[in-house]
């Protein structure tokens, strides 16, 4: 049996610890985390800010006490300051000043990611916020109790930025959404889908400023008052910056581990790093992108983090399983418009030099004679021109089509071709779908 030290009790770390404790007896598990809480579901922050849920209690699914009841030792508010990989020792200091020198047989790095915060002039003004941790969301909500905060700008129109824009609008604030890209969610969807969301945002009263880069912030009496871009100045009372995340790699950025181009730890299919007995999971590590032939990449999603933690936990304890890679399956629901995607978009394929074809269709999910709860759905499938393997899909509707993307995720993982999809066995019942399902119709239209 082994002594296993886990640095970071976030989603990936939590999944790893639970996998070890629930399936293998006799191991000593010691965890360190710099935060005061475990397992906060950051995806729920926008719902909380937007008053779509009553509070944050349901956004936690694991506690220190639950870990300890299973036999783990957990040190909260105890950041790890140094790791001696040669001698297998972790050094940390608790909030009360207690020093820890913890030896290990196996080490799991689960340090997560950090928000990318550009150094804008005026960036230290009050009411310029970031949203990553529970404490960040609580601070925003507390500040929104101040009725003088009437106008909020969100910088960054990816998933999180779009969700926050909706949240601030639902909270009763005038809301601006700013991004230097020509539209929103450009990394997840092709323009025709992104424009659906952009129109949806505008129709719901959000002031969109795409194609504008932030230049600096201005303030008065220490508080932000103005957002200045390359195209204009906008009066604001709060700014939320959410332009992306980077691996939290301060503990291993000194060349002791092999790293990816963006600083994430390179891992193999067992979550092993370049050092013996050291594993990395979650946002601090790479994934294998099946839509790009299984090459290493970086996709910071909680779902990826959990899977990587499970894989590492089993391999550490002697059960050899491989991470099958990911397709980046994701989704978003804003003002009732639901959009899901996985794999490559057409634009992404062009960036990566992949020669692709696409097929698209807009149709109802159910039979056309169903008069209620049967809105249009738009689907786009991206497939390899030569091999005809499906590489990605995007779907948008006010109807919940999210389950369909799971099928496409598996199709990308398994190399299913567009031609195989044409005759997929999809049942027909008017309550559920049409005789020619929109998926089948799109496949049949493929060149």
Language model: regions and residue ranges:
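Beta1-alpha1 glycine-rich phosphate/pyrophosphate-binding loop at the start
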Residues: 2-73, 165-189
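Rossmann-like dinucleotide-binding cores of NAD(P)H-dependent redox enzymes
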Residues: 59-60, 151-153, 159-218, 299-304, ...
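Flexible, glycine-rich terminal cap/loop adjacent to redox cofactors
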Residues: 7-11, 19-26, 34, 243, ...
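Glycine-rich dinucleotide-binding loop and its adjacent helix/turn
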Residues: 109-171, 207, 261, 267-269
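FAD-site-proximal beta/loop scaffold in flavoenzymes
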Residues: 124-148, 221-226, 233-311, 411
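A Rossmann-like FAD-binding core segment of flavoenzymes
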Residues: 26-28, 68-95, 101-102, 170-267
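A conserved FAD-binding loop/helix module that cradles the flavin
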Residues: 281-345, 432-447
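Short hydrophobic core segments
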Residues: 102-112, 236-244, 309, 388
